[in-house]
């Protein structure tokens, strides 16, 4: 997940998983993610992701979607800077913490208790779609789903860890080959997009479950057409 919250519906590191007939893949299973978040009073650092703060600083505030918002640090940060924020996560435990974080600084966020695949979201409804450290099963068609949510002229920001230890990943119950990667995100967009990356960038994390990851792979894609 992240300097802040792990996106996993995509969300910010990886945790619980389930076996598919073809191997391993994470899914938007509320009970699994609730168990993950219930292990600790706070899983992530509570700070927004560095790549988000850098990229959002170049954009005029508009409508933002935080996919796999976890405990809400990115969503709250965007809201404090004038964005109209929708944030989704399959974990009710995580969303309760996210709501509390928003209330503590008196900002409004629309919280959606769902994973990406089943969430009711407007096509072309967002000027920024932010996806950090996701665990998106390729079988669910995540590239097309994410792309469909971005408004013309809008930005899709997809960030993942640069270092993936495959053996460790398999031990923790997921197969990176079955999940959307930065390379897959960039390659899958096709015409109608101006794509930068994946670009390797250092990250600095003060604490939380993602602190052992030191570099990000960042994909920034701007939708150049309305088709």
Where in the sequence are the language-model features?
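Conserved class I S-adenosyl-L-methionine
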Residues: 2-59, 62-70
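Conserved SAM/SAH-binding beta-strand->alpha-helix loop
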Residues: 91-93
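Conserved SAM-binding loop
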Residues: 98-99
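Conserved SAM-binding strand-loop segment of SAM-dependent methyltransferases
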Residues: 105-116
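A short acidic, Gly/Pro-enriched loop at the edge of an enzyme's catalytic core
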Residues: 121-128
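A short glycine-rich, Lys/Arg-flanked "PGG" loop and its adjoining helix->strand segment in the class I
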Residues: 141-152
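Conserved beta-strand signature within the Rossmann-like core of class I S-adenosyl-L-methionine
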Residues: 153-161
């Amino acid at each position: 997940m992240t300097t802040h919250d792990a996106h996993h519906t995509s969300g910010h590191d990886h945790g619980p998983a389930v076996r598919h007939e073809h191997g391993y893949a994470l899914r938007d299973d509320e009970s699994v993610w609730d168990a993950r978040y219930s292990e600790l009073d706070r899983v992530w650092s509570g700070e927004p992701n560095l790549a988000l703060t850098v990229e959002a600083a170049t954009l005029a505030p508009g409508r933002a979607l935080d996919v796999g918002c976890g405990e809400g640090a990115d969503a709250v940060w965007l809201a404090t800077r004038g964005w109209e924020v929708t944030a989704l996560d399959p974990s009710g435990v995580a969303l309760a913490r996210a709501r509390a974080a928003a209330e503590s600084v008196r900002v409004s966020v629309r919280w959606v208790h769902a994973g990406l695949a089943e969430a009711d979201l407007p096509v072309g409804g967002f000027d920024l779609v932010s996806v950090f450290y996701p665990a998106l099963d390729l079988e669910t068609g995540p590239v097309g789903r994410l792309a469909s949510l971005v408004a013309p002229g809008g930005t899709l920001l997809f960030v993942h860890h640069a270092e993936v230890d495959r053996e460790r990943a398999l031990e923790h119950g997921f197969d990176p080959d079955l999940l959307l990667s930065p390379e897959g995100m960039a390659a899958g967009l096709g015409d109608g997009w101006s794509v930068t990356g994946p670009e390797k960038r250092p990250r600095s994390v003060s604490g939380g479950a993602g602190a052992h990851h030191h570099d990000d792979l960042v994909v920034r894609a701007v939708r150049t057409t309305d088709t």
